[in-house]
């Protein structure tokens, strides 16, 4: 078992934390806004660990669902499950075990948060199979990656206001943007094996679609900033996020594999500066 532990870590992408951060930034945004800049430390610990666990569980489930496709994709052919180094039942067991631990974390929280966690689990577990049916499965991913937003509001306020759902919509647009960049890396392989992705659906308009999704995301955050009366610190963070999005255009405009992958990875900075703007606003406002 100990000899297989490094394989399990690779299965859940512990060597690639970018995915966890893409889940964590929107969740932290929601925690800070829901608590007026004063989130309780227990909630921060619960949601941070829960994000890491559920992202890891999702990776294991994704590899299980895609095991027959991944062997035909250059980037994924050497994954532990695809290459036969671990078995399918092990991936499922890890996904179930990590999900159970994540659920244990939220047991001290209110009933609404626990009810929402069931929905979140269903969405996260079903996402890997959406590539067989949906033309833009990345939109479904945005729901899965963003469900920490309504859960955070529920945990803090025991209700989910309209603002939380608006933030979730922003996250859906952001997910379509960055995961389309990711899908542009595998475009040729995905055409061969018949998987549906937003990069294929958008076709020659893929770059324009990515930039439109960034514009929608950042436009919603303009509405959030104006509605909540955020100050200069927030707008500096927002402007930095705009700069990140414009930089991504320079990376993806020629549709080359490695620059597209670099753009995907750089979304950690886009999410990070948005959160920094929110946190800085509350800090400077005395909260």
Swiss-Prot record:
Protein name: 4-hydroxybenzoate octaprenyltransferase
InterPro entries registered for this protein in UniProt: HB_polyprenyltransferase-like, Prenyltransferase, UbiA_prenyltransferase, UbiA_prenylTrfase_CS, UbiA_sf
Example GO biological process: ubiquinone biosynthetic process
Gene3D superfamilies the record matches: UbiA prenyltransferase (1.20.120.1780)
EC number annotated for this UniProt entry: 2.5.1.39
Disulfide bond residue pairs: none
Similarity field: Belongs to the UbiA prenyltransferase family.
Ranges that cross the membrane: 41-61, 89-109, 133-153, 158-178, 202-224, 266-286
Catalyzed reactions per annotation: all-trans-octaprenyl diphosphate + 4-hydroxybenzoate = 4-hydroxy-3-(all-trans-octaprenyl)benzoate + diphosphate
UniProt main location, coarse: membrane
Cofactor: Mg(2+)
Record's function text: Catalyzes the prenylation of para-hydroxybenzoate (PHB) with an all-trans polyprenyl group. Mediates the second step in the final reaction sequence of ubiquinone-8 (UQ-8) biosynthesis, which is the condensation of the polyisoprenoid side chain with PHB, generating the first membrane-bound Q intermediate 3-octaprenyl-4-hydroxybenzoate.
Domain of life of the organism encoding this protein: Bacteria
Coiled coil, from the record: none
Pathway per the UniProt entry: Cofactor biosynthesis; ubiquinone biosynthesis
Topology relative to the membrane: Multi-pass membrane protein
UniProt enzyme class: transferase
Any one cellular-component term (Gene Ontology): plasma membrane
GO MF, one annotated term: 4-hydroxybenzoate polyprenyltransferase activity
Lineage: Bacteria, Pseudomonadati, Pseudomonadota, Betaproteobacteria, Burkholderiales
């Amino acid at each position: 078992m100990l000899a297989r532990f490094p394989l399990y870590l690779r299965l859940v992408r512990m060597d690639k934390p970018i995915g966890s951060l893409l889940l964590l930034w929107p969740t932290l945004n929601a925690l800070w806004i829901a608590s007026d800049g004063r989130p309780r430390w227990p909630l921060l610990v619960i949601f941070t660990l829960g994000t890491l666990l559920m992202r890891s569980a999702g990776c294991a489930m994704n590899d299980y669902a895609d095991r027959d496709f991944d062997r035909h994709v250059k980037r994924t052919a050497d994954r532990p499950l695809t290459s036969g180094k671990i078995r399918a039942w092990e991936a499922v067991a890890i996904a179930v075990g990590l999900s159970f631990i994540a659920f244990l974390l939220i047991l001290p929280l209110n009933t609404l948060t626990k009810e929402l966690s069931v929905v979140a689990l269903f969405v996260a577990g079903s996402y890997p199979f959406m590539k067989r049916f949906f033309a833009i499965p990345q939109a479904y991913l945005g729901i899965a990656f963003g469900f920490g937003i309504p859960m955070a509001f529920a945990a803090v306020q025991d209700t989910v206001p309209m603002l939380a759902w608006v933030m979730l919509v922003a996250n859906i647009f952001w997910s379509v943007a960055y995961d389309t960049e990711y899908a542009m890396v595998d475009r040729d392989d995905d055409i061969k094996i018949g998987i549906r992705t937003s990069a294929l659906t958008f076709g020659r308009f893929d770059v324009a679609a990515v930039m439109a999704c960034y514009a929608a995301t950042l436009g919603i955050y303009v509405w959030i900033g104006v509605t909540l009366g955020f100050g200069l610190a927030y707008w500096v963070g927002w402007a930095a996020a705009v700069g990140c999005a414009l930089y991504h255009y320079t990376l993806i405009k020629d549709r080359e594999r490695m620059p597209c992958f670099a753009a995907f990875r750089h979304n950690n900075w886009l999410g990070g500066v948005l959160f920094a703007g929110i946190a800085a606003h509350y800090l400077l406002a005395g909260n």
